[in-house]
């Protein structure tokens, strides 16, 4: 039987990158997915690809609590529950030393990652049945502290704290809460960060980052999605308050 047979999954940031790769894998494993994001055209394209029998979408900026509440309600009205929640929306912020970092960008980066994840959990948890799974996409930077990306690092560490509290609160209902920590992953999102960090063209920037990874290469979105599947499925029935790194050894 498919590992997510008849499961309903909400994924924020589901229109591209890791979120879309996760949606594809989950649908192939028997799930129905409700995708939430800010790009309506990409969301519609994702639903068309996955099939309307298997997917739906809603537009919301996760920093807007009312918008999140509406997006969650739309999915709950259609499916009745969310067996799995993947809080995956994110932005990269600036690349600059702390003394030069724009305060408004710092605040926005924390808002998307931390306040956004809080909004998603706050409004989805009432629709998660006992024994469900909540996954927050953190980052390898939620385990280490590279220079130049202070807002992103702070936000990704903060998500771990939110996860740990939620895991304790929801344990009596056997709802598991975990973070996943991708290392550099081959997506346009990562390409942009690397080019700004290195001031190199994309291919050269990627090689510079490959050199930081003990296993010598970027992960693919599909490899991160496999980690998502583990945390979403019954295979991880006794895994909660855990930080799952898929980073080629970068955080080791």
Whereabouts are the PLM-identified features?
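The beta1-alpha1 cofactor-binding region of Rossmann-like NAD(H)/NADP(H)-dependent oxidoreductases
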Residues: 40, 59-71, 103, 222
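Substrate-binding pocket helix/loop in short-chain dehydrogenase/reductase
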Residues: 96-98, 102-107, 209
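Conserved glycine-rich cofactor-binding loop
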Residues: 15-16
């Amino acid at each position: 039987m498919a590992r997510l047979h008849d499961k309903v999954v909400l994924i924020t940031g589901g229109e591209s990158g890791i979120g879309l790769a996760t949606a594809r894998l989950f649908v192939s494993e028997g799930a129905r997915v409700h995708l939430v994001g800010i790009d309506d055209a990409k969301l519609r394209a994702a639903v068309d690809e996955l099939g309307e029998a298997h997917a739906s979408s809603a537009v919301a900026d996760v920093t807007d609590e009312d918008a999140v509440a509406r997006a969650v309600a739309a999915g709950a009205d259609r499916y009745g529950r969310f067996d799995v929640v993947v809080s995956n929306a994110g932005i990269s912020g600036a690349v600059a030393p702390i003394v030069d970092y724009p305060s408004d960008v710092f605040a926005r980066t924390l808002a998307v990652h931390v306040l956004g994840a809080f909004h998603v959990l706050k409004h989805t948890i009432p629709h998660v049945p006992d024994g469900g799974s909540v996954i927050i996409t953190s980052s390898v930077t939620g385990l280490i502290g590279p220079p130049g990306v202070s807002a992103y690092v702070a936000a990704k560490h903060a998500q771990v704290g939110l996860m740990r509290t939620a895991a304790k609160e929801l344990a009596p209902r056997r709802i598991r809460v975990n973070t996943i920590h991708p290392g550099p992953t081959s997506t346009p999102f990562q390409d942009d960060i690397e080019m700004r960090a290195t001031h190199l063209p994309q291919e050269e920037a990627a090689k510079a980052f490959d050199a930081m990874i003990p296993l010598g290469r970027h992960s693919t979105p599909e490899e991160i999605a496999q980690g998502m599947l583990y945390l979403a499925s019954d295979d991880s029935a006794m895994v909660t308050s855990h930080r799952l790194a898929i980073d080629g050894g970068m955080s080791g």
